[in-house]
From Swiss-Prot:
The lineage of its organism: Bacteria, Pseudomonadati, Pseudomonadota, Gammaproteobacteria, Pasteurellales. SUPFAM superfamilies: Homeodomain-like. The gene is fis. This is DNA-binding protein Fis. HAMAP family: DNA_binding_Fis (MF_00166). Keywords: Activator, DNA-binding, Transcription, Transcription regulation. Belongs to the transcriptional regulatory Fis family. GO terms for molecular function: DNA-binding transcription factor activity; sequence-specific DNA binding. InterPro entries: Fis_DNA-bd, Homeodomain-like_sf, HTH_Fis, Trans_regulatory_Fis. Signal peptide: none annotated. It comes from the Bacteria. Activates ribosomal RNA transcription. Plays a direct role in upstream activation of rRNA promoters. It comes from Histophilus somni (strain 2336) (Haemophilus somnus). NCBIfam families: PRK00430.1.
């Protein structure tokens, strides 16, 4: 579950720890762990387009949630994301969302 209590706080992910307690940790920690796992599985192989891979993993669900939150209002969604509406439309099309 992703949450942001106020704009000044980092996005957090709720995680169930080994003692069955739910804790919140910054989203960036989860991204780091996912990348660490991915890179450890490469076994020395080269990888291309890692930036695009990571961006797509984050950007697609972010766009989906923002569009749900704004009830499909692209102008409001673009404002929330800090991008212009044309850029938002391109990104929605890229992920088959618009």
């Amino acid at each position: 579950m992703l949450e942001q209590r106020n704009p000044a706080e980092a996005l957090t992910v709720s995680v169930l720890n080994s003692q069955s307690q739910v804790t919140n940790k910054p989203l960036r920690d989860s991204v780091k762990q996912a990348l660490r796992n991915y890179l450890s599985q490469l076994d020395g192989q080269d990888v291309n387009d890692l930036y695009e891979l990571v961006l797509a993993e984050v950007e697609h669900p972010m766009l989906d949630m923002i569009m749900q939150y704004t009830r499909g209002n692209q102008t409001r969604a673009a404002t929330m994301l800090g991008i212009n509406r044309g850029t938002l439309r391109k990104k929605l099309k890229k992920y088959g969302m618009g």
